[in-house]
């Protein structure tokens, strides 16, 4: 299990990947409104996880992983989503999955 400072540092890195993911989807003209909405929710959950008290952060990370799963499914199902946006969603999803195994 990660120490609190390590967990926050790792979560901050994941937060950056999620922000990149959101920008990529927002910038993709082919992204559906559904994909964009699900990715925005993923981004919102990341903000929530960063602001969560230390003793509740593990639960927030689990909730964030669930949002990542939803974003990944939406992105993979979006036929007009570009490869850059899809890759960014996959990267953010993988990052939170790895973090979850460490907490």
Language model regions located:
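Function-determining surface determinants
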Residues: 1, 5, 33, 58, ...
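Charged, low-complexity interaction regions
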Residues: 23-34, 51-57, 76-83
